UniProtKB/Swiss-Prot annotation:
GO cellular component: cytoplasm
Coiled coil: none
Native source species: Ureaplasma parvum serovar 3 (strain ATCC 700970)
Cellular localisation: Cytoplasm
UniProt keywords, alphabetically: Cytoplasm, DNA damage, DNA recombination, DNA repair, Endonuclease, Hydrolase, Magnesium, Metal-binding, Nuclease
Reactions listed under catalytic activity: Endonucleolytic cleavage at a junction such as a reciprocal single-stranded crossover between two homologous DNA duplexes (Holliday junction)
Record protein name field: Holliday junction resolvase RecU
Keyword Plastid: no
Any one GO molecular function term: nucleic acid binding
Family, per entry: Belongs to the RecU family.
Binding site for Mg(2+): D57, E70, Q88
GO biological process: chromosome segregation; DNA recombination; DNA repair
């Protein structure tokens, strides 16, 4: 199975969304770069190695708050928790413990739906159920469903407001 473009749909959607949000609201959200060491260049073929594990996909500031999140997608009826690497969980934990907003955006490709699950929700779910996956219906019932406003743009303003309400309620 070729995983080369795994997550590209969601990444493009988020990149377009944060570009618009940054412009409209003078926010600062950015995709993290992956450090790569280039070993060899042969015509158009570049051979390289990842220097170190990346933390999460995105980070940003808006109105004095810090946000850090990972983007994942699945074509199944559940989200496999093992899709989140241990170093990413550790990073999200540190953000959470330092009063930042740490979360994941999950895309269910088969349903064309997008959700936010906070770090705390993820940990609570796993500690309570010990399950290795989270069913789609749980996301529908428990998580913030993201609204797409323009073709290919998440309503980031609404997402941030909903996330703040969810965080303060948990």
């Amino acid at each position: 199975m070729n995983n080369k473009n795994n997550g590209m749909h969601l990444e493009v959607l988020i990149n377009k969304s944060i570009s618009l949000f940054n412009l409209q609201y003078q926010a600062f959200f950015k995709k993290r770069c992956v450090d790569i060491i280039i070993k060899n260049i042969d015509n158009s073929y570049v051979q390289g190695k990842i220097k170190q594990k990346s933390e999460t996909d995105y980070y940003g500031f808006y109105k004095g708050d810090y946000f850090d999140f990972e983007a994942k997608q699945t074509n199944k009826n559940s989200f496999l928790i093992k899709q989140i690497q241990p170093h990413q969980l550790a990073h999200l934990y540190l953000i959470h413990k330092n009063s930042g907003f740490s979360f994941l955006i999950i895309c269910f490709i088969n349903y064309n739906l997008y959700f936010i699950i906070t770090f705390q929700q993820l940990i609570n779910y796993y500690q309570k159920t010990k399950r290795k996956s989270i069913p789609f219906q749980w996301f529908k019932d428990q998580c913030i469903e993201l609204e797409i406003i323009f073709p290919g743009v998440i309503n980031f303003k609404k997402m941030i407001n909903d996330l703040k309400l969810k965080y303060y309620d948990d």
